[in-house]
Design a protein with these regions (language model features):
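Residue-level detector of flexible, active-site-proximal loop/helix-junction positions
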Residues: 2, 96, 128, 137-139
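Amphipathic alpha-helical interaction segments
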Residues: 14, 57, 115, 155-157
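Active-site beta-strand termini and strand-to-loop segments that position acidic
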Residues: 28-31, 116, 135
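CN hydrolase (nitrilase-like) catalytic-core segments centered on the catalytic cysteine
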Residues: 43-131
């Protein structure tokens, strides 16, 4: 978001004159599931989700530092991403207050887990806490078997 008080795009420090041909977000495996990491701003762009689908990622971790009462938008965006990609999404949002120069920001928390079916499985409200969930490889496989989004894209040469 390119606001005078919060230019999130500048945090990525990519020269605007340089074309970026490839992305390579972090991916690692644990317990038979591939995990990807997608920072808050990146979650808005299809290219990251396409990459995770190509790599057969089963859970995307989305660390954020969101403010401006944007929680409803984040919930809808990440529920849709989880469902259309048949994977878990775990959003960890900063909570608390911070001052940057003359500006003060209130980070509202509201971390949550979304299932491959697009449902909120567990969440924290506007409070500090520990959020636990089980990432179930069988649930990922069941969602992929039911909707077949990835399979249909691959069969059409689109992925």
């Amino acid at each position: 978001m390119d606001y005078p008080h919060w230019n999130e795009e500048s945090f990525f420090a990519n020269r605007k004159s340089r074309k970026i041909g490839k992305i390579s977000p972090m991916i690692f495996s644990e317990g038979g599931v591939k995990f990807g990491v997608c920072f808050g701003y990146e979650a808005h762009f299809d290219v990251f989700w396409r990459y995770f689908m190509q790599k057969n990622v089963g859970c995307v971790l989305v660390p954020c530092a969101s403010t401006f009462e944007s929680g409803g938008r984040w919930r809808e965006l990440l529920k849709m991403r989880a469902f259309t990609n048949s994977l878990y999404v775990i959003r960890a949002n900063r909570i608390g207050e911070a001052k940057f120069g003359e500006s003060e920001f209130k980070f509202y928390g509201e971390s949550f887990v979304v299932t491959p079916g697009g449902e909120i499985a567990n969440e924290l409200k506007n409070e500090e806490g520990v959020l636990m969930c089980e990432v179930d490889a069988d649930e990922i496989a069941a969602a992929r078997g039911l909707w077949k989004f990835r399979k249909n894209l691959v069969s059409r040469g689109l992925l």
